[in-house]
Amino acid sequence: MVDQGCEVANHTHDHKYLTKIGAEGIVSQVGSTNQKIQAVCGVSPVLMRPPGGYIDAASLNVLGSMGMPAIMWSIDTRDWQHRNAQRTIDTVLRQVKDGDIILMHDIYSTTADAAVVLIPELTARGYQLVTVSELAAYRGGIAPGHKYSQFRP
């Protein structure tokens, strides 16, 4: 994935909600996952997506001490819930704006089917598909311990 230009972020080892596991739990979940990703992919993640989107000030503070921001989303396709490719496509195309972060889950075949349609369609509409780090860099950067859902112009 890294060789193809994808960015690999941290999503915890056990999909535990950061707001429920305290500082030690966050350090353990995020730290061990960073180590495993480094071992497998050869890169250490610089971004963290909280499971379920659950994040609070205390969790952000811990992530900040680990040098990581929390990356959220501005479009939730709810693909995990309905598992319908056309519904995912319609949601994205109806809502998408420059600087959006779109939440989709690669574990469902219907999401992959939607991506096959969305990628060329979004490109045809003039959107550039970039990593979150690239998007953040284009729009002024990103800081550890902060939460980001989009990067509007």
Which stretches of residues belong to each language-model region?
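C-terminal domain-boundary segment and adjacent tail
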Residues: T110-P153
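Metal-dependent polysaccharide deacetylase catalytic core of the NodB/CE4 family, i.e.
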Residues: M1-Y108, I142
